[in-house]
Amino acid sequence: MENKKFFTGENIKISLHFHNRSLFLYSNVNFLSNFIDAKGNLNESVTLLPFKKLDIQLNFKVPSRGIYNAENYLLEIHDLFLISSRKINFNNKFTFTVYPRNIRLPLEIQKLIDNVSNFSKNNPNTHTSDTYSYIDKYMEGDNFKNIHWKLSAKKNNLYVKKFDTIKKCNIAIYVDMTNILSLPGTFPTVTDEGLVSFSLSIIKYLLWKNEAIYLYIENLKSSSFQLENTEDYYSILSYYLEHKSLGHGNFFDKVLKKEFQTIENHKFIFIITYTILPMHAKTISKISADCENLIIFTLLDVPNKTKNLLRNTNVKVVKVTL
């Protein structure tokens, strides 16, 4: 193979080298595989001459991300008169990875994220630790509630418990992978590949801006991640390589309701989904009331009724064009 790193929809080339060591002539050679569809077969008839070598280049595209083990592939070879045929298995095995397509975020989306990032840096989300880190003598301005009475009585002086201020993650991203399989057949081009590629682009953009992220992915089975640096990006990439959309789920009215307490801990919420319906407006409005900014990215147009229901909230809905 010419390259070990490929992306969905990208042209992949495999070079095949044959040596016919027999006296027979073989015509109409076809390449069969468990990872290449009919369009990926050899485009024209190939003939293997007796005692001759032949180099063939196979061009194909893989429409879906994943790790492909190319161990089940073979040649179907017909005789000269096309009366009989036989299949020859390849002994050599190879594995290649097809990654989600890289998407450059549109300028207007970059500006949205930049505004959130700048506000986040200027307004850190902090809380006081539940346990004190050390004890010090009381000074004017210290909280009287934090006095360590037992130690103060023993030392005959006032001592206070000191608590660390902990910086909390400001930004949370919720990714809905559940509804793609329930979309009508009128949207054949809308797949989870687009959703995954877009979510990875936003995650990467934020991490490269040194933003910590709480990431929640719903795919019938929930998965959550704390992302703090660029190395964490690759753990999410690995997750997406191993997981596809599994089926329909009630993301807004069941999944997000369970997350209300966690959502309240973050000032900025991004939701990435396929679309939002009027029946989701109540849940979305409740989420928006507990955060500074709620941005929902959709792959499909949102009904006007939904937009009207969210008009007087701080919710921004962005239709993504991939």
Q: Residue spans of the language-model regions?
A:
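Short, surface-exposed amphipathic charged segments that create phosphate/polyanion-binding patches used
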Residues: 111-113, 231, 310-313
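Short, conserved, surface-exposed binding loops centered on an aromatic residue
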Residues: 163-165, 205-207, 228-231, 259-263
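Von Willebrand factor type A / integrin I
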Residues: 15, 242-322
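Short beta-strand-loop
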Residues: 217-243
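Short, glycine/charged-enriched secondary-structure capping and boundary segments
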Residues: 187-189, 230, 284-287
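General structural signal for secondary-structure boundaries
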Residues: 63, 140-143, 190, 229-232, ...
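Disordered, low-complexity tails and leader-like regions
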Residues: 139, 154, 182-184, 220, ...
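An amphipathic, basic-hydrophobic helix/alpha-beta surface used to engage anionic
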Residues: 1-224, 268, 272
